[in-house]
Amino acid sequence: MGIVNVTPDSFYAGCRFGPREAVDEVLRQVEAGADLVDIGGQSTRPGSDQVPVEDELRRVVPVLEALSGRVSIPLSIDTDKARVARECLSAGASVLNDVSALRNDPHMVEAALSAQAVILMHRGGDSPKTMQDCPQYRDVQGEVMAFLSERREAFRSAGGDPARVLFDPGIGFGKTLEHNLSLLKHLQDLARLGPVVVGVSRKSFLGSLTPDSGPADRLEGSLAGACWAALQGVRVLRVHDVRATKQALAALDAVLGAD
């Protein structure tokens, strides 16, 4: 799953695009081998503020409309707002990726019913602005799994097909370094719920493991995290660097398939 942020303030400067540039980037990622591309019009990095609905729509809807008929892979909309979800699903997106797990907007569960797939993510704290203030868990794995199971049930209770749900533990969203590493180590446990989505690409916890100068310095750690997640049975890897990740996974597959 490639990442395309139609935002001026994404944490990774290499993935900040205007609408026209975003279309080109989606096409580049498709050529590089992306199986799915996630398009977002609001940064959800730690400390970020909410973007008005109209601003978010102005960023992402033109991208989806411009891609209509030009790509054969599914497109995902990364939003926590029901109106944005509805309009983007009408404009060509088929997957809804909600970092609030359908909680931020009271109408989001209903909006999600028209998506072919729904990604529910765990986020500690009330919002991206405050989620890293003081993350605390007694049992991070158990609490994340219980939360995601409850959100799937909320979707099912509203008439949604639970088979359409994918689960994201929310690496870097309201978690300390230790929380992130524990969740990654035990991804196989999370996979008992269903298909898992993981995004470690360029995130700050990688910079805590080895000295770096920022997100641009974290490709190698991102590839290591992607390969580990794949070994744990993760179905969807959310990445900025599609070509490099595909190459790393191809090498991993070759080793695993050798006699």
What residue ranges belong to the model's regions?
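N-terminal glycine-rich anion-binding loops that anchor highly charged ligand groups
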Residues: 1-2, 28-41
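Short acidic capping loops at alpha-helix termini that bridge into adjacent secondary structure
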Residues: 161-164
